[in-house]
């Protein structure tokens, strides 16, 4: 099992994954990122027309790189710190001697 999948599994089991997602959603809403991305989607759809030839997948492919660059550094740093704290907890739990009683 890779470190990434172990962390992923741990965060799912402990409920930390949903806490991280909730934190991310709230921070992106607070900073106006969600509104910016929503507006970007509307503008792209208006440019491409409404003839239904532009798919959701195409919209996602076009918006995703731009949207990622708009995520504020403060939000990225906060999430990285949260993930580091989780990794530290995992490491500390792994280092604790097992109770042999």
Swiss-Prot record:
Single GO BP term: positive regulation of transcription by RNA polymerase II
Bilayer-spanning residue ranges: none
Subcellular location field: Nucleus, Nucleoplasm; Cytoplasm
Record keywords: Activator, Chromatin regulator, Cytoplasm, mRNA transport, Nucleus, Protein transport, Transcription, Transcription regulation, Translocation, Transport
Protein origin, superkingdom: Eukaryota
Gene Ontology terms for molecular function: C2H2 zinc finger domain binding; chromatin insulator sequence binding; TFIID-class transcription factor complex binding; transcription coactivator activity
Gene3D superfamilies: 1.10.246.140
GO cellular component, one term: DUBm complex
Principal subcellular localization: nucleus
Role: Involved in mRNA export coupled transcription activation by association with both the AMEX and the SAGA complexes. The SAGA complex is a multiprotein complex that activates transcription by remodeling chromatin and mediating histone acetylation and deubiquitination. Within the SAGA complex, participates in a subcomplex that specifically deubiquitinates histone H2B. The SAGA complex is recruited to specific gene promoters by activators, where it is required for transcription. Required for nuclear receptor-mediated transactivation.
Family classification: Belongs to the ENY2 family.
PANTHER family with a match to the protein in the record: ENHANCER OF YELLOW 2 TRANSCRIPTION FACTOR
Record text on subunit structure and interactions: Component of the nuclear pore complex (NPC)-associated AMEX complex (anchoring and mRNA export complex), composed of at least e(y)2 and xmas-2. Component of the SAGA transcription coactivator-HAT complexes, at least composed of Ada2b, e(y)2, Pcaf/Gcn5, Taf10 and Nipped-A/Trrap. Within the SAGA complex, e(y)2, Sgf11, and not/nonstop form an additional subcomplex of SAGA called the DUB module (deubiquitination module). Component of the THO complex, composed of at least e(y)2, HPR1, THO2, THOC5, THOC6 and THOC7. Interacts with e(y)1. Interacts with su(Hw) (via zinc fingers).
Listed name of the protein: Enhancer of yellow 2 transcription factor
Organism, scientific name: Drosophila simulans
């Amino acid at each position: 099992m890779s470190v990434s999948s172990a962390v992923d599994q741990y965060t799912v089991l402990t409920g930390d994954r949903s806490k991280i997602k909730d934190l991310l959603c709230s921070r992106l809403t607070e900073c106006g990122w969600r509104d910016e991305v929503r507006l970007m989607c509307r503008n792209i759809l208006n440019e491409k027309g409404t003839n239904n030839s532009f798919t959701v997948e195409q919209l996602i492919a076009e918006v995703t790189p731009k949207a990622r660059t708009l995520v504020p550094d403060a939000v990225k740093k906060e999430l990285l710190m949260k993930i580091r704290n989780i990794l530290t907890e995992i490491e500390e739990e792994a280092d604790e001697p097992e109770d042999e009683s």
